[in-house]
Amino acid sequence: MMEAMDTQTPTYSNDELTAALAEHLASLDRDDSYRVERVLKRSSVETTELVYFEGTGGGSLGPFVRKRIDASAQIGGAYERLFAAQRAGRRFEHLPRIVDCRRVGDELNVVMEYIEGETLEALVDRLGATPDYARELYPALCDAVGELHAGFAIAGETSAPVIHRDLKPSNIIVTGANYTPDDGLTFSSLVIIDLGIARVWRDGADADTVKFGTRPYAPPEQYGFGQTSVRSDVYALGALLFFCLTGVDPKPGLDMREQCEARGIPTSLADAVCMSMALDPAKRFASAEALGLSLIH
C-alpha cells in the first residue's frame, strides 16, 4: 500500500500543520502523542505508518505519514535536509511538507503531510495509457524532478543536486486527475514521495555507498557501476514515460527501441524514451528540464 490513500480524509494547510503541532512537538514524549491508524508499508529497514497526532486536550490532527527508518541502513538523510530547508523558509511545490524529523535511538523518525490523490500507477490503471500523459502530465513530472535536483541548500550553503534513485509509478502522487477526449488529461498537483534512498551528489565520488532501487527504473550505475547523478533520475524518467505510454514497466536487458516499436509508441516519444534510458549516462538528456522541453517542442 502507498502513502496516498483514503481520499475522503480531510487534510490541513501548511500553516495549520505548523501552528497546531508546534506546541505539542516541544514535548519530549512525542512518540506517545501519535496514534498509529495502520501500517502502510514495511521493509527490513523502514516502516511507513498512517498516524494521527493526539493533542493534550483530547483532540487530534491528521492524518500524517510517519516513517521509522533504521539508522544503520544509511538512508533517510534527504528527509533531514528537506526538513531543515523547509524550517528555514523554503517551499517546494512538488515535495511533501515535513512536520517533524529527528533521530531516536537507532531510528530516524520522519513525520510528513499526508498527500491526497492517487499514485501514477493507479492513475494509469484507472484512465489507461495514452500519449496525452506526455503532453499534459509528464512535463510537470520533469519539473518536479528538477526541483529535487536543484537541491535543499539554505542561506550560506552550496547547493548540490539531490538524486531520488527510486522514481517509479508508485512514488508519484497526482491529485485531481481527470481525462476526457476533448480536454485531455487535467490535474491539480503532482508530488514526489518516498525520499528514503535519495542522496546528495558528491563531486569526485566513484560509486554510491548504498545501492537500492527498483530494477525496471534503475540505471546500471545504481548497481555499482559508478556514482548516481541527475542523469540517473533521467533514466528513471524515461522508464516512467514508457509506463505512461504503455501501462507496463520496461523490461531491463532488452533493447528499448524494439520495446517501443512493439508497443506502437510514436517515433518522437520513442526517441525521448530511448535517449533517456541510454546505458551510457553521457548519452542521456543532461537534465530533467531538457527532457521535459523535448516533449513540448
Question: Where do the model's predicted regions map?
Answer:
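Conserved short submotifs of the Hanks-type protein kinase catalytic core
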Residues: G105-T119
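Conserved activation segment of eukaryotic-like protein kinases, specifically the C-terminal portion
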Residues: A207-E221
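Conserved HxN/HPN-centered segment at the entrance to the catalytic loop
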Residues: R91-D100
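Conserved small/polar residues in nucleotide/adenosyl-binding loops
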Residues: I296-H297
